[in-house]
Amino acid sequence: MLDVITKTNKSELILGGQKSGKSRRAEFLARDWLLQSPDHKAILIATAQPWDEEMQQRIARHQRDRAERVPGLTTVEEPLQLSQTLNRLSRPDTLLVVDCLTLWLTNLLMPMIGENTINSPSNQHLAGYFTDYAAMLSIAISKSAGPVVIVSNEIGLGVIPMGHEVRAFVDALGKLNQDIAQVCNKVTLMAAGLPLSLK
């Protein structure tokens, strides 16, 4: 399952559904990076926000599991300013893991739901809003001094529920995944804990 992150294969987008093994693969890549050299560091940039009690419990569980599986992995919480954080933490000896783009996009979307911006089918602000953030993130990944692993959900394979909000989110995430796949050296689709190499 494990591929080695090297200087020639320095960025990877990991896609998959819920409980497909996306985060586990990212953790294994981080652990392998740490084992390659005592000088190596690994930082996980967590985008989740504790919106409710269930999410709080989920975040706490992920933190415990990561601490057991990858003891040397440092966690930085950043729900919004993802490209700026990548730029700030980027170093040749440091692997950066972003987990995940889906929650990051949700965080960007939440204020717009409150303003009813997303509910207007004719409003073009939404597409431009996400395009700017995706462009900045793509640049940060391509210019990173060290390796970067990006985790994101693939949610467009099943039946899409009714509602403009849901369809707009699925479209935005699908476009974001395409943009990030273009700049990553490697793209992996996870299913049942097994990797399928797409790029």
PLM segments and residue spans:
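SAM-dependent methyltransferases
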Residues: 1-9, 132-135
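Conserved P-loop
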Residues: 4, 8-90
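Residue-level signal for inorganic ion chemistry
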Residues: 26, 62, 97, 153, ...
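Residues at the starts of beta-strands that form the adenosine-phosphate
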Residues: 40-43, 94, 147, 186
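Loop/turn-to-beta-strand initiation segments
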Residues: 72, 92-95, 144-149
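A basic- and aromatic-enriched beta-loop-alpha substructure that forms the phosphate/nucleotide-
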Residues: 79-80, 88-112
